[in-house]
Structure formats: C-alpha cells, structure tokens
Amino acid sequence: MKFYLVGGAVRDNLLKLPIKDRDYMVVGAAPEQMFELGYKQVGKDFPVFLHPKTQQEYALARTERKTGSGYGGFSCDASPDVTLEEDLLRRDLTINAIAQDDKGELFDPYGGIKDIESKMLRHVSDAFVEDPLRVLRVARFAARFHHLGFTVADETLALMTKISQSGELEALTSERVFLELDKALSTQNPQIFIEVLNQCQALEILFPEIHALFGVPQPEKWHPEIDTGIHTLMVLAQAAKLSDENSVRFAALVHDLGKALSPKATLPKHHGHGQSGLALIKVLCARAKVPNEYRDLALLVSDQHQNVHNIRELRPETLIKIFDKADLWRKPDRLEQLATACEADSKGRLGLENSPYPQADYLRESFQVANSVAVKPIIEAGFKGAEIKEQLKLKRIEIVTEFKRNFNESAIE
C-alpha cells in the first residue's frame, strides 16, 4: 500500500500558488484495509475515504471505462492491482496528472512538469473526449491560469471541439454548467472562459444568447472594437478588475444580449437593446438555473445601463424612478453594483479602458441626496397612507432637483 499526493495540490505547489485542498491516491489497497486503518468511506460511485484525523480525502487508485453518455456514464475499477500510471492516465490535463510520494519524490509519466514550464494546458490521452465536462473544466483552467501565461494546446482544443460537435454537451446538467461558469467568474480573467468556449464551438450550445453577440456590429464612433461579442469580453474583463462580486461580473456578461435582436436594417444602431435583452436574460437564467440574486442584478443593469451612461441629462423624476425600480431604498448595496457594472461597460471599449467614468459618482451622490429625505416629518405633517409615499416622492424629486442645479452651476464655474 502506497500513498500519493495528487492533482491540484501538486500542480499548485509547482506553480508556487497557495494550496487549498489536498487530495491523496492510495495504490495497492482494498477497502477493507482502509477500514482497518480507521478511514471512513464517503464515495458512492468509487471508493473515497476520509482520513480519521485530518478528514482529508484518500481515493483508491482506479481506472474508468466509458459505458454511457455524459460525464456520469462511466464504470470504474478500483482493485488493488490498479497502478499509479493507470490512475493518472484517466485524468484530464497533464498538469493535473502528477503525483508526489511521502518522501517528496514526483511521479510525472505524462509530461505535466514540462507543460507547466511551457505554460500549456494539454490533455493526458485521447480518452479526454469521453467526458464532456472537461470542455468546461479546461476553459475554466484557461481563465484561472491566464495571468500566468497558460494557453490551451491546439490538439486539446481540437478534442474539445470534437466533444462539442458530438452532442455530448447536452448531457451536462444545468446545475453543473452554471457551477463551472460561477467558478470561472471568480477568476482574474473570466472572459477567457467565454473565449475558449467560443473557440471550441461550445458557447453556441451552452450559452447561445452570448454566442449570438459575436459578429454583431456596433457604431465605431462609440465602439472602436465594433464587434458586440468582443465588447462583451472586454466588459467582463473590466468587471473583474472593478469588482470581486460574481453577480456584478455576470451582469456585465449579459448586459448587451438585446443587441443580437436588433433588426439588420438598423445596424449598427441598437435602439432599446437594454429592454429587448430582458427576455433573453430571463430565458438564459431559467435554463442555467442562475441564482435569483444574479438574475435580478443582470436585469437591472440591462434595463438601466443606458440611463446611467446619460445620467447627467436625466430629469430628477427619472432618477427617482430608477431608484424605485432598482429598489435602492431597501437594497442600497445594489447602487454600487449598478454603478460598477455600468463603469465596466463604459471601459470595456477599445482604447477607452482607462477613461474616467464620472457618471458613477453622480449616481452615488444623487441617491445619497434622495435617500436623505426623512419620512418622519411627513407623517408628523398629517399625511396618511398613500399620501405619505407620494409626499416622499415629491420631496425626493425636490431635493434632487436642487442637487442637480447646484451640480450644474459648480460645473460651469
């Protein structure tokens, strides 16, 4: 019986990255031997055990054989005669197929260390195509390690494309697809996840609403990058720089879905695209089982980003309507999320990545002013029921009008 540290812990140690989880592989052992040592079994589909003291996972070395469709269509053999090399052969990427024994010696039968040195994401074997989930995993690794210079090997991208064309991606559950998207959104470069999925033809299958944006032109005057798909990638990249919140990053990703619906006769203009995109966002979120928190912010950003861009020109009444629609009185955190997503949209344009976005501060300040109106004096003045709400609205419009006047006067000075 031999124990090996495997997978992400070995990879991240070689990359000099923080190690989050440690997974171990056990060669030459049967479940009965693990029980005798005090380990508790937790895996149903294949033997995974928890260490009696550390609670870390120890999996018996195993091989896998494709028996059906999807990422669950496998049977496995975890007998004691499965070798280290056989177990590592079933793994997705060479950088994840390195093992380390208890003396620190590395075992790298498939060239993972060389690929780490050359910054390459490469499949271990042609069995890669048997698991459609690997398309999403590799795209996520590409996003996660992009800042280190990693790219996907051409031959691996070819196998990912083969999976996309096979129809196997349809076997993935909505929950699993969103889980991979959510993990990718939390990386430094989530736009790479979308880019890689597009390169291997998976984007049009998993997220057709996003794929439809590529090739849709925008006015060059406002969008030097022209292509709406490219703009979307740039906005997502900016959102990742401006916010750690995945909900903000998701809103940035889907804020322009309506541009794919613009009539060809009106291109490259996209009148009302924020509103026309709302139905597409709802469809995408329902299909992918996106959390309500993400969906609601995405709908708000799509609906209002044009207004925020032009906020200086809006009437005070319109500003209050935006605050009402966003429910900022009860959910003030949304203000920062909305401002950040709109700033990402503005900066997600070729050559304008470092341009200022004063609209965000104007939005913050105008809401702060409107939110300073107290309801107590209104009640004390004798107003009741619906009258209170109406008076509150009028007072807010009045004070925002004064703020707008003072702001404009100071701008002239």
Swiss-Prot record:
Reactions catalysed according to its record: a tRNA precursor + 2 CTP + ATP = a tRNA with a 3' CCA end + 3 diphosphate; a tRNA with a 3' CCA end + 2 CTP + ATP = a tRNA with a 3' CCACCA end + 3 diphosphate
Under the heading Pfam families, the entry gives: HD, PolyA_pol, PolyA_pol_RNAbd
Keyword terms, alphabetized: ATP-binding, Hydrolase, Magnesium, Metal-binding, Multifunctional enzyme, Nickel, Nucleotide-binding, Nucleotidyltransferase, RNA repair, RNA-binding, Transferase, tRNA processing
- Positions contributing to CTP binding: G8, R11, R91, R137, R140
Q: Which InterPro entries match?
A: CCA_bact (IPR012006), HD/PDEase_dom (IPR003607), HD_domain (IPR006674), NT_sf (IPR043519), PolA_pol_head_dom (IPR002646), PolyA_RNA-bd (IPR032828), tRNA_CCA-adding_enzyme (IPR050124)
Task: Give the protein's cofactors.
Answer: Mg(2+); Ni(2+)
What residues does Mg(2+) bind to?
Answer: D21, D23
- Give the EC number: 2.7.7.72, 3.1.3.-, 3.1.4.-
As to how many cofactors bind and how, the note says:
Magnesium is required for nucleotidyltransferase activity. Nickel for phosphatase activity.
The segment(s) forming the HD domain are: 228-329
A molecular function annotated in GO for this UniProt entry is: cyclic-nucleotide phosphodiesterase activity
Give the highest taxon in the source lineage: Bacteria
Q: Does the keyword tRNA processing apply?
A: yes
**Could you give a single Gene Ontology term from the biological process aspect?**
RNA repair
Anything else the record notes?
Answer: A single active site specifically recognizes both ATP and CTP and is responsible for their addition.
Q: Which family does it belong to?
A: Belongs to the tRNA nucleotidyltransferase/poly(A) polymerase family. Bacterial CCA-adding enzyme type 1 subfamily.
Query: What is stated about domains?
Result: Comprises two domains: an N-terminal domain containing the nucleotidyltransferase activity and a C-terminal HD domain associated with both phosphodiesterase and phosphatase activities.
* Role according to the record: Catalyzes the addition and repair of the essential 3'-terminal CCA sequence in tRNAs without using a nucleic acid template. Adds these three nucleotides in the order of C, C, and A to the tRNA nucleotide-73, using CTP and ATP as substrates and producing inorganic pyrophosphate. tRNA 3'-terminal CCA addition is required both for tRNA processing and repair. Also involved in tRNA surveillance by mediating tandem CCA addition to generate a CCACCA at the 3' terminus of unstable tRNAs. While stable tRNAs receive only 3'-terminal CCA, unstable tRNAs are marked with CCACCA and rapidly degraded.
Quaternary state and interactors: Monomer. Can also form homodimers and oligomers.
Question: Protein name, please?
Answer: Multifunctional CCA protein
Gene this chain is encoded by: cca
